[in-house]
Design a protein with these regions (language model features):
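Short cysteine clusters
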Residues: 62, 86-89
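N-terminal pre-ligand scaffold of iron-sulfur
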Residues: 1-81, 94-95, 107-123
Length: 123
């Protein structure tokens, strides 16, 4: 007898502390655009999918303005590294490291991201 294949759409998960939190279905992420996700502790994450299918997550709060807007920023790449530009003051943040490309003294939190089949719990 064969096991049925998992037909659930893949989910995007963020690592928070020692657990994985399901954020959304991968299909909800439009390449080149971000979405905001409310985290259990009240913070927000900005989640992105690039055109090659890679996913990234950083803190949604723009450290220069204090507004939760990075998920609405424009994405691009600089020297082969993906970034998002704040929609307010246009500072660019590396999506892999969180470092501000325009002011090396400023960073935003990054989150480890994975894509997995749907599950009823975090592990």
């Amino acid at each position: 007898m064969t096991r049925p294949r998992n037909t659930q759409p893949p989910k995007v998960q963020l690592r928070l502390y020692d657990a994985w939190l399901t954020i959304c279905e991968l299909s909800a992420l439009t390449p080149g655009r971000g979405v905001a996700a409310l985290l259990p502790d009240g913070r927000q994450a900005a989640v992105f999918r690039d055109r090659s299918g890679r996913t990234y997550a950083i803190d949604n709060r723009d450290p220069f303005s204090g507004a939760a807007v990075l998920s609405r920023g424009l994405t691009g790449s600089h020297q082969g590294r993906p970034f998002v530009a704040s929609p307010l003051l246009k500072q660019r943040f590396d999506l892999e490291s969180g470092r501000c490309l325009d002011d090396g003294t400023v960073t935003v939190t990054t989150y480890e991201v994975r894509t997995r089949p749907d599950s009823a719990h975090t592990d």
